[in-house]
Amino acid sequence: MRADSVLARRTALLLRDPARAAETVARLTERGACAAVCQLIDFELPADTRALDASLARLLAGDFDWLVLTSVNTLRALKHRAAALNLRLMIPAGTQVAVVGEATAAALRELGARVDFMPRHDHSARGMLAEWEQLRAGEPASVLMPQADIASATLRDGFAARGWAAHIVIAYRTVPAPGNPHLALQTPVAAPDLPAGSYLLEPEHLPGASGRLDAVFFTSPSTVDNFLARLPAPPAHLALVAIGDSTAARLRARGLEPAATALFPTPDGLINAWEQSLRADLHPPR
């Protein structure tokens, strides 16, 4: 723990399942902070996977110039369906792959696949459109983009404006936790042990626990909506930290001003944003 950490003895609320929150918990612990882990959303495969399965078959047949992956979950959905269909998920030699950020790139490399494009600066749909040289060159291409049921239209509209033929298919659904285990996007894993001071928080206990929290980390617009469904009027002392611009925009649309927005959509990005906001406007830990 850093002795001078402004985060010491403060607690951040993480709205993810414990396994996915583990890295953020570890990073907070290194800086002397604690975490309350409260899973509000879950991810399911579509009840009808025929469209996804057909898109997967076309991908494996080499029908697309590009595969666009905007989250680790989209890759998980492809892997799940490939396994269910007894297929090997591999990227054809003639298909290039674009990813939104480092987490998705790392998951892709675990498959032994390459990453042909990832934005350097803005790890978002907007950043992809701004930095994608082949897209900006204007030469038409075919794209497969599996995505969430609540994904924004940013990439779809960007492809259409540049004459690219985008085949968009729903790969997974975002639902309140817990989701249907029969449609689970991945096999549940045991919750990791949490360090001293950090704890699991059941969603129904969130309103009563809010006074003991110092910050909330929002990792998607849907986490904003599900949090506010449980706690419509967050206490004024809570620092609302957004993982990116679209999440910050959702907070503002709901009448709340983010205390900070992460420069990078990573655990360190969120924690750094929170820390910088505290240094700018110091408050005693609650």
Outline where the language-model segments fall.
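Conserved beta-alpha
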Residues: 1-286
